[in-house]
């Protein structure tokens, strides 16, 4: 499964390549580093499993929000807005191979 966080403020999409990704501002403790003072050292964890993306807040000071609501844990759906202390991303989920599932048109003979 392809899971990406698309920065709402612009910038390149962040592809989540690990099954479990620790998100925060400290590079020694986190797989995905967000360099912002309001993001906790270890802010949240993102888990890819069975074609879904799950979130668990790690007791962050300023909280984790999904679609404006503060959450402790839950599933993220395509198009959800994930906010870590005001830093916002749109969640994109899709197949590993974007061509998978596409059917080529039959060529006339």
Question: Over which residues does each language-model region extend?
Answer:
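Catalytic-core "active-site belt" of small-molecule-metabolizing enzymes
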Residues: 11
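Regulatory inter-domain linker segments that are low-complexity and enriched
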Residues: 1-4, 87-109
């Amino acid at each position: 499964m392809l899971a990406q966080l698309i920065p709402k403020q612009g910038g390149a999409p962040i592809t989540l390549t690990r099954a479990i990704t620790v998100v925060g501002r400290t590079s020694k403790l986190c797989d995905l580093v967000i360099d912002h003072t309001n993001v906790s050292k270890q802010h949240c964890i993102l888990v890819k499993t069975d074609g879904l993306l799950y979130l668990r807040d790690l007791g962050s000071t300023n909280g984790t929000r999904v679609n404006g609501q503060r959450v402790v844990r839950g599933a993220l759906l395509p198009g959800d807005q994930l906010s870590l202390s005001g830093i916002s991303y749109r969640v994109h989920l899709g197949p590993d191979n974007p061509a998978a599932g596409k059917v080529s048109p039959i060529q006339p003979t």
